[in-house]
Amino acid sequence: MGMAYMRLNPEEESYDPLRAIILLERAANGGDAEAQYELGKLYEKGIGIAQDTKKALTLYRQAADANYADAINDLGFLHYQGGLGIIQDQKLAINYFGQAADLRHPEAMFNYAALIDDGIVAGKNPKDAAKYLYDALRSGAAEVLNQLLKNPKMFKQATRLELQRQLVKVSLYDGAIDGQIGPGTQKGLKRAYGLKE
């Protein structure tokens, strides 16, 4: 995979998308889920090869069947938004997001938390949403930290309260449980992410 990635970086002297495709096809045909996913992206975008969205979807599904979280998360988006000719299917999209989140995919954990917060994931509550947000922070997802610091009210107060409780539970916050993402909670979020102040 490393050789293929090197050949896909246009800033490297070794940039050669055609060679990368050969390497990825070999690995994908051998059952490598990451290669299936990466090759699918090339087919989807038409990089180094003729664009073929059906082939891209086939490769994404193969990678997802092997529990490759990036592919599962992307299939969630495609079903949620109706991309690449897929008919929108919110229920299936939520299942994909949940599966990818349970595999600890940071973006999926954030997305799934947002869907839970919106009340559209049956059987889940604000405590579940907060746990997925916390886990996304712990995975080192900078975008999750940035969203929570810059736009905390994108999540309802009940989820913010539970997130504060989660931070207290793991000794990263000792302030008020009020649902406000003030300086103390921000410090706790940064500590959950791995920053030390």
Q: How should these model regions be labeled?
A:
Residues G2-N9, E38-K45, I49, L59, ...:
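Hydrophobic face of amphipathic alpha-helices that form TPR/SEL1-like repeat modules
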Residues E12-L23, A50-L59, I86-Y96, G123-Y132, ...:
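Structural signature of tandem alpha-helical TPR/SEL1-like repeats
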Residues A35, A71, I86, A108, ...:
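TPR alpha-solenoid repeat register
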Residues N95-G98, D102, F110, A114-D117, ...:
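TPR/TPR-like (Sel1-like) alpha-helical repeat modules
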